[in-house]
């Protein structure tokens, strides 16, 4: 009787595993397409639909709160607007990086293909976007400015132990990739400040 119970449990485990593999293999291409299609908008940069402050709710889950559904965690979005109320260029590059990091934290399917797609298409592009608003005439100043901008977002986005653990696990899935040829989702040269 015990032997039959073990066989039934193993059979259930195998069936559940096969169903999961089928689900992931069927849905991964759609998820990768969604990753490639997700872009920052001018409305995001200009604060057209700013969310309210989520308060303590922001840190209760890895994903946090995105009430305005723009792909950027609300507390991070509000921090960027608070710090840079008069610089649309800086907001644009920081929001794009926040969007990329949030995509990493909210993937419904986490596997090598989706993790690599987010880093290759969105994170590498967002970092290049951050670099685009700093002059390279003084490389020490360039490095300091770009590090400051990158860390401003990263320190707010990856700000709990659960988020740090999640990101550590996320990067285990990233395969080799080439850096995106694209830069910013928004043409920052059209922004006055």
PLM features per residue range, with description:
Residues 1-69, 75-193:
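Calcium-binding acidic motifs and repeat modules
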């Amino acid at each position: 009787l015990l032997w039959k119970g073990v066989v039934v449990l193993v059979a259930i485990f195998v069936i559940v595993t096969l169903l999961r593999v089928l689900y992931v293999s069927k849905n991964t291409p759609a998820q990768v397409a969604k990753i490639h299609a997700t872009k920052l908008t001018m409305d995001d940069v200009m604060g057209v639909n700013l969310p309210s402050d989520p308060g303590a709710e922001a840190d209760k889950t890895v994903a946090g709160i995105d009430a305005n559904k723009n792909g950027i965690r609300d507390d991070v979005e509000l921090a960027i607007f608070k710090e840079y109320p008069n610089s649309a260029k800086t907001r644009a590059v920081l929001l794009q990086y926040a969007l990329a990091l949030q995509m990493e934290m909210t993937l419904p399917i986490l596997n090598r293909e989706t993790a690599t797609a987010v880093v290759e298409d969105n994170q590498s592009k967002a970092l290049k976007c951050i670099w685009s608003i700093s002059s390279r005439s003084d490389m020490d100043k360039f490095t300091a400015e770009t590090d400051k901008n990158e860390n401003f977002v990263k320190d707010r986005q990856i700000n709990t132990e659960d988020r740090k653990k999640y990101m550590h696990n996320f990067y285990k899935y990233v395969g080799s990739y080439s850096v995106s040829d694209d830069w910013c989702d928004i043409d920052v040269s059209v922004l006055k400040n």
